[in-house]
Amino acid sequence: MLLPLSAAAQYDEPCDSITSIVERVMDKKIKATFNVDFCTSLNGYFTEGDFDGASLKLNRLRLDLKGGISEQFSFRVRQSFNKAYDKNSTENVPNSLEYANIQWHPNPGFKLTVGKQFLTIAGYEALANSMYVREFADFNDNLNFYRLGITGAIKLDQERNHELQLQIANNRGGTDADIYSYGLPAGIEPTKLPFIASVCWSGYFDDKAWNLIYAASVAPVAKGKNLYYLSCGNIYEKGPIFAYLDVMYSREEIDTQQRITSLQSGGLVPVTVQNAEYLSFIAKFEYKFNSKWSAYVKGAYETSGIYKENGIFGAGRYMTNWNAQASVEWVPFEKDKGFKLFAHYLYKGYSLEGPAAFLNAYVPDIQRVSLGAIYAIPVL
């Protein structure tokens, strides 16, 4: 008699199994939303004004599950299908897994987030839902903002208009070889503490029409070499108007973004650049004509330079680049605002400055015209 009972007990579903959790979600014992985010477009590509060709592209496809386990605990898991699935060596998860975290909020004034999450860096473009960003500035396009970490968020006032965040997270998912195309510079040893520490303040003003976000970060990237970020987002939203101005700055004692390092071409023995700095200004103005139609213009102005001579690289500005964008968007169905059609134009220009002449580099101007669709499909 004991054998059948033991066998039955052996196959009982544990209460924390995947199947059990899914059943609780479906039974509404866990309050959750589950979206399939989808963005595709027909794109025409141009280089220096010459037509290169056209193609259909699936820009974004991802699964986004988030919800509450109890009054004090919530979670989020988001999987992208447009990023690498290779498991990185540091975090033991692929870059395609953007969110995988648990949030503890014991009271309205405090929240602790543990797991894979967004780096605490200010700037609206970086923080925005990437489904609705047609083209990122080069500064944001060269950073991986999703890292394993711990973040504490504290509300600073009773109205909860001001918040302070403190975060410790991995600065990278892989090894130095995954980040630096030509390895660390000669004579420099890798860091044993590849973490990034950030502090961020966010505040609302003028009946929440203004949201200001300011952040600072520091990370050791090698022994005796650091990376510094200063960033801010200034967001305005009232009535039919939405606008923002971001300022992003990084001072990199080793060129982590690799934008100057990648300019090296034939005739040189390529090395990883040191003492790089990047500055970006990103602005957008959007106007909603009615519940269905909206339009925006957006632009970015960015500089890349070296603040201190190292090896064959003298100090000075190496590159200036900019982009200009314009878009018209239409929501055809009043009852399904998650579905949107858009037409978008992009121009990206690059100018190499005097100190970069010896690199023999060439970065062409490019243009893109797109017609596309976005759909956030609510599965749950």
Predicted regions and their residues:
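Loop-centered beta-sheet repeat module
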Residues: Q167, N171-Y228
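Short aromatic-enriched loop/helix-cap "lid" or pocket-rim segments at secondary-structure transitions
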Residues: E125-A128, D178-I179, Q257
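Outer membrane beta-barrel
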Residues: I21-G44, D50-G174, S202-D206
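Glycine-rich loops and low-complexity Gly/Arg-rich segments
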Residues: L61-R62, F136-D141, A177-D178, P190-P194, ...
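Exposed loop/turn and edge beta-strand positions of beta-sandwich/beta-sheet ligand-binding modules
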Residues: N59, S96, P108, Y146, ...
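Cleavable N-terminal export/targeting peptides
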Residues: M1-I18, P378-L380
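Outer-membrane beta-barrel architecture
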Residues: S20-V22, R62-D64, A100-Q103, T151-A153, ...
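Outer-membrane beta-barrel pore domains
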Residues: D12, T47-F51, S89-T90, A209-L380
